């Protein structure tokens, strides 16, 4: 049976890391946890569960996952986040594919991540979900192939790989627990929006006042209605507002960075002009 390496990146995930590790450890050969200097018991819990833990200062989402990926000894890699859990049915499906030696029919496998509200014990009917490539052969794809972003961490195929028809969506699902509290969601929104704003600056993105003023409205509509957060009731309304605010924040922070940069340039030009005038008056 082809062996699988699993990796998880963490930061103060003591409350959730055990659930994540326990959902993968029986179907993989190794579990690697790359921790970005947690101040809680994340490292101790992960080690107690048999994971190999490496502490690494934060490199950004893409950098951290690329580093973790590089530590995996096997070609087949399974990545989940600390706030995710493979269902028993998904564990069995993956185990069956590899036990029957059929894994190489595809280069990568997508997983449906069902969004679980923090107060739920099981998925709600019609719960929203995301499809993400999380099980893949690193000979053909890698997180390290992501360019121009430190936040949009995704598995990207090598340029010379024809992956048409080579990605399979697994039938069973994993669970994504959206947050532990409103405070945690707001803290994450603030951090993540700052990282996204840095990416936008690097990409040379511009911003209109119209987009800034309509961003929250659009993303609330998208989260609550299109992504079906309404299935969580009023809690879904609250979470949609936080999500929309996070999208607004990234643009507000982009605007702030652009204004600061503009002011720095203006001051530099004024200083240069002043020195030029002083030099001319001296002559």
Curated annotation (Swiss-Prot):
Pfam families on file: Glycos_transf_2
Enzyme nomenclature, EC number: 2.4.-.-
UniProt cross-references to InterPro entries, sorted A to Z: Glyco_trans_2-like, Nucleotide-diphossugar_trans
Leading EC class: transferase
SUPFAM superfamilies: Nucleotide-diphospho-sugar transferases
Signal peptide: none
Repressor is among the record's keywords: no
GO molecular function terms listed in the Swiss-Prot or TrEMBL record: glycosyltransferase activity
CDD domains assigned: Beta4Glucosyltransferase
Keyword vocabulary terms for this entry: Glycosyltransferase, Transferase
Residue stretches spanning the membrane: none
Family: Belongs to the glycosyltransferase 2 family. WaaE/KdtX subfamily.
PANTHER family for the chain: GLYCOSYLTRANSFERASE, POLY-BETA-1,6-N-ACETYL-D-GLUCOSAMINE SYNTHASE
Protein name (record): Uncharacterized glycosyltransferase RF_0337
């Amino acid at each position: 049976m082809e062996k699988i390496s699993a990796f998880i990146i963490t930061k103060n995930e003591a409350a959730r890391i055990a659930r994540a590790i326990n959902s993968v450890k029986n179907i993989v050969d190794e579990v690697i946890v790359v921790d970005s200097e947690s101040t809680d018991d994340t490292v101790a819990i992960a080690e107690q569960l048999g994971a190999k833990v490496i502490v690494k200062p934060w490199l950004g989402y893409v950098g951290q996952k690329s580093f973790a990926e590089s530590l995996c000894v096997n070609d087949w890699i399974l990545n989940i986040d600390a706030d995710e859990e493979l269902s028993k049915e998904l564990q069995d499906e993956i185990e069956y594919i590899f036990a029957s030696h059929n894994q190489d029919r595809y280069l990568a496998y997508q997983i449906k991540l069902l969004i679980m509200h923090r107060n739920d014990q099981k998925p709600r009917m019609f719960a929203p979900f995301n499809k993400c490539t999380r099980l893949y052969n690193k000979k053909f794809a890698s997180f390290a192939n992501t360019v121009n972003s430190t936040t949009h961490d995704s598995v990207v195929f090598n340029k010379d790989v024809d992956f048409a028809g080579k990605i399979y969506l697994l039938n069973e699902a994993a669970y994504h627990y959206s947050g532990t509290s409103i405070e945690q969601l707001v803290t994450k929104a603030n951090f993540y929006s700052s990282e996204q704003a840095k990416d936008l600056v690097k990409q040379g993105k511009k911003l209109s006042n119209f987009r800034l003023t309509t961003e929250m409205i659009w993303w609330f509509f998208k989260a609550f209605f299109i992504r079906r957060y309404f299935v969580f009731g009023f809690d879904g309304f609250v979470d949609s507002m936080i999500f929309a605010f996070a999208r607004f924040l990234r643009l507000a922070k982009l605007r702030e960075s652009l204004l600061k940069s503009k002011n720095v340039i203006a001051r530099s030009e004024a200083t240069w002009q002043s020195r030029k005038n002083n030099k001319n008056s001296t002559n």
